[in-house]
Amino acid sequence: MPLLVEGRRVRLPQSAGDLVRAHPPLEERARLLRGQSVQQVGPQGLLYVQQRELAVTSPKDGSISILGSDDATTCHIVVLRHTGNGATCLTHCDGTDTKAEVPLIMNSIKSFSDHAQCGRLEVHLVGGFSDDRQLSQKLTHQLLSEFDRQEDDIHLVTLCVTELNDREENENHFPVIYGIAVNIKTAEIYRASFQDRGPEEQLRAARTLAGGPMISIYDAETEQLRIGPYSWTPFPHVDFWLHQDDKQILENLSTSPLAEPPHFVEHIRSTLMFLKKHPSPAHTLFSGNKALLYKKNEDGLWEKISSPGS
């Protein structure tokens, strides 16, 4: 069954702006979200999701109470939630393979959902802006279309994307919202930024920059974050890129050079350095081809734990 708003099937294709104008509650929700002040989210109880990662958990989780992601310019952050059991998935989509990613998101929630119980699937889409290359617009269209193709009824509750998440300054366009968090217990979604993007922030970012596909990073049953084992081919021309100035890196390695947050270039440089240092991660980072496992400690912070059999 299709994507629904207020119980009615969404007419596609249409722009995000036209869609919310046809459904005033959607427009009002986007307006309220844009109007929020940004909350700084601390590391306690947080599971931070990087680009091309997804994480899913439920209110039964004793370790994780918040899922979040930020630094989305043309990317979209997607939250899918089952209202019956509270199972919640957050993912940071960049349009690499939306057709494959939406079924992954759906299956992650279905692995929790007892379909005999009451409740419905609700989706929230946030991110993107009116960028020159129309990458945000394309991703919005892809996500709406793919959710509409799924077998289950999916209720579109929040749509704050592309032109609905756009602000203009000196004739340049920027996103209003770069990041969001969702409270697993209360289902509240709010504007957020994060100081702590770990664990293993560089390793996870390197996998994405090296072209890795969307992956699930968290096992809610064991309450463990699982990283790897990853493999990638050596990053092409890594020395060339490391010798370029900030302007060249911004213009060539960003989908939206004018709209990136201030730390973007520093983040790309450190990720390139990591890729140069670890051209074959299977040998240097994943001893015995074992995943790196992390679990929250009593203070709500990530702590590395031993892999089984190590």
Curated annotation (Swiss-Prot):
Regulation: Inhibited by micromolar concentrations of copper and zinc ions.
Keyword Hydrolase found: yes
Entry's pH dependence statement: Optimum pH is 6.0-7.5.
One GO MF term attached to the UniProt entry: protein-N-terminal asparagine amidohydrolase activity
Protein name: Protein N-terminal asparagine amidohydrolase
Site (Essential for catalytic activity): C75
Pfam families, alphabetized: N_Asn_amidohyd
Catalysed reaction equations from the record: N-terminal L-asparaginyl-[protein] + H2O + H(+) = N-terminal L-aspartyl-[protein] + NH4(+)
Gene Ontology process terms (BP): adult locomotory behavior; memory; ubiquitin-dependent protein catabolic process
EC primary class: hydrolase
Superkingdom of this protein's organism: Eukaryota
Entry annotated with the keyword Transmembrane: no
Any single GO CC term annotated in Swiss-Prot or TrEMBL for this entry: cytoplasm
UniProt function note: N-terminal asparagine deamidase that mediates deamidation of N-terminal asparagine residues to aspartate. Required for the ubiquitin-dependent turnover of intracellular proteins that initiate with Met-Asn. These proteins are acetylated on the retained initiator methionine and can subsequently be modified by the removal of N-acetyl methionine by acylaminoacid hydrolase (AAH). Conversion of the resulting N-terminal asparagine to aspartate by NTAN1/PNAD renders the protein susceptible to arginylation, polyubiquitination and degradation as specified by the N-end rule.
Major location category of this protein: cytoplasm
Gene for this chain: NTAN1
Organism: Homo sapiens
Oligomeric and partner information: Monomer.
EC number in record: 3.5.1.121
Keyword set, alphabetical order: Cytoplasm, Hydrolase
Effect of mutating C75 to A/S/T: Abolishes catalytic activity
Compartments (UniProt record): Cytoplasm
